[in-house]
Amino acid sequence: MSTLALVAFVLWAAFLRYLPKILNFLRLQRFAKTLPGPTIGELIANVKKGEILNWLKELREKHGPVFRIWFGKDLMVMFTDPEDIKQLLGNNQLLTKSRNYELLEPWLGKGLLTNGGESWHRRRKLLTPGFHFRILSEFKEPMEENCRILVRRLRTKANGESFDIYPYITLFALDAICETAMGIKKHAQLQSDSEYVQAVQSICRVMHKQSFSFWQRLNVFFKHTKPGKEREAALKVLHDETNRVIRLRREQLIQERNEWKPEAEQDDVGAKRRLAFLDMLLLTQMEGGAELSDTDIREEVDTFMFEGHDTTSSAIAFALSLLSKNPDVQQRAFEEASELEGREKESMPYLEAVIKETLRIYPSVPFFSRKVLEDLEVGKLTVPKGASISCLIYMLHRDPKNFPDPERFDPDRFLVNEKQMHPFAFAAFSAGPRNCIGQKFAMLELKTSLAMLLRSYRFLPDKDHQPKPLAELVTKSGNGIRLRILPRDENGTTA
C-alpha cells in the first residue's frame, strides 16, 4: 500500500469514527437555535464579574422558564418551571450527572454523587440503610459535642462587634462530619492549622475556582499550574488519611468482633460504641453482603465528607445571617429551641420552616445537572441526545407563583402555604430517584446546631453587610457572613 493510500485510509477511518459525533453536534446546534439564550461573550463577561446567579436571574426574566447556554462545545438547557423540573427529577432514566461533576472525581472518584447508571443503583441500594432514622439518631451526640466547642469559641466574639462567622461554622461542620463519617476526632476547631484541615479547605477552594473557569477545567494543562499542584498535594493528604482510617477501623472492628459473645452480638455492637458511617461500610464488606473494595469505601466516605461539610456550613451561616436581620423570626425560633431543648430529634415545626426558608433563598446547591443520553421529551420540547439539562433551583425558589415576594424571608410559607405549593416548587435536597440520601442527616445537624446557637446567643445584623451569593459547587457568600452576637443568660435574655 502506497503512503498516499495509507494516509487516505487513516483519514477515512478517522472521518467514519467521528462522523456520528459531528452529526450529533450539528443536531445540537439546530436545536439550540430554537431556544433563546446568551452569547458565549456574555457568559465569559459574567463569569469574570462573579455574578452568575444575578445573571441567570436576568436571563430567566428576559427569556422565560426555558433557555440555553453554550459552555464551550457543551449545550446546557436551563429549566426553572416546577412542572418541567418534576418531569426531569422524577425521570428514572435521567440519572447520569453532567460534566460539571467531573471536577469532583479526583477527590470523590465514582462515589454516589458522581456515579451513574447501574453502578449508581447498586451503590444507592447499599447505602440507603445507613441513613435510617434510628441510625441517624446516634449521630446527634457528636453533633452536640462539637457544637458546644463552637459555642465556647464564639464567646470571644460575643461583644456586639461585627465579625465573619463563616470560618467558625465551617470548622464546626468539619469536626462533626469527621466524627460521624469516619468515627475520628479531627479537632479542626482547636487545630485549624492541621495538615488535614488545611487539605480539606485547599481542595474545596481549588474546586470552587475551577467550577466556572474554562481553562482550569482542562486537566491536561491545569495539573501543571500552581492551583493544580495545590490540588494534587491536598488529594494525597486526604486520600492517605482516609485510607489510614479505613485500615485502623477495620482492625478495631475485627478485634471487637472477636471479643463479642455470639448470643449477644446484635446488642453489643451498639453497646460498645456508636458506629460511624465508615464502620457500616466496613461491616458490609466484611460480611460479604456486597462487593466493596477499599477504594469504593474511600469514595463514599469522601463523598459524605464533602456533601456533609460544605453544604451544611453554607446553610447554617446563611440561616444565622437571615435570623440576625429578622428579630421576630429569631425570637420565635429561640422560644421553640428552648422549649424543646434536648429533643431536636423530634418535630420542631418552626425551626424546620426557618431552615427550609433559608434553603429556599440560598439553596446550598444552586442547580442540578444531568447528561441526556437519549432524546428526552420535556413539555413541548425534545432535548436531543448529547445535550445536558440543568434544573436551576436558585430560580425555581424565586418563582412568584409559588413564593410571592420571593426575596422576603418568611418561614411561615412552609407552615401556612406549603400544601398550596407545587410539589416541586421547593427542591433544596433535589427530588426523585437521585434526591439527597443524607437530607435527614442534614436536617438533624442543622436543627441541633441552630437550636444550640440560638439558646446561647442573640444574633444581630451588621447593617453595612449584605451577603453576595456565589454560584460555585456550593452556594457561598463571596464577602463572608458578617454579623454581631451577644450572649444570653439563663433566662434567654441579653445584656
Swiss-Prot record:
Topology in membrane: Peripheral membrane protein
Keyword Protein transport annotated: no
Entry's Gene Ontology molecular function annotations: heme binding; iron ion binding; monooxygenase activity; oxidoreductase activity, acting on paired donors, with incorporation or reduction of molecular oxygen
Superkingdom of origin organism: Eukaryota
Residue positions binding heme: E307, C436
Coiled-coil annotated spans: none
GO cellular component: endoplasmic reticulum membrane
Enzyme class: oxidoreductase
Swiss-Prot/TrEMBL keywords: Endoplasmic reticulum, Heme, Iron, Membrane, Metal-binding, Microsome, Monooxygenase, Oxidoreductase
Keyword Ligase part of the UniProt annotation: no
Entries under Pfam families matching the protein: p450 (PF00067)
Cofactor(s) listed in the protein's UniProt record: heme
Catalytic activity, EC: 1.14.-.-
Subcellular location: Endoplasmic reticulum membrane; Microsome membrane
InterPro entries linked: Cyt_P450, Cyt_P450_CS, Cyt_P450_E_grp-I, Cyt_P450_sf, Cytochrome_P450_Monoox
Coarse class of the protein's main subcellular location: endoplasmic reticulum
Listed PANTHER family: CYTOCHROME P450 4D1-RELATED, CYTOCHROME P450 FAMILY 4
Protein role: May be involved in the metabolism of insect hormones and in the breakdown of synthetic insecticides.
Family: Belongs to the cytochrome P450 family.
Protein name: Probable cytochrome P450 4s3
Gene name linked to the record: Cyp4s3
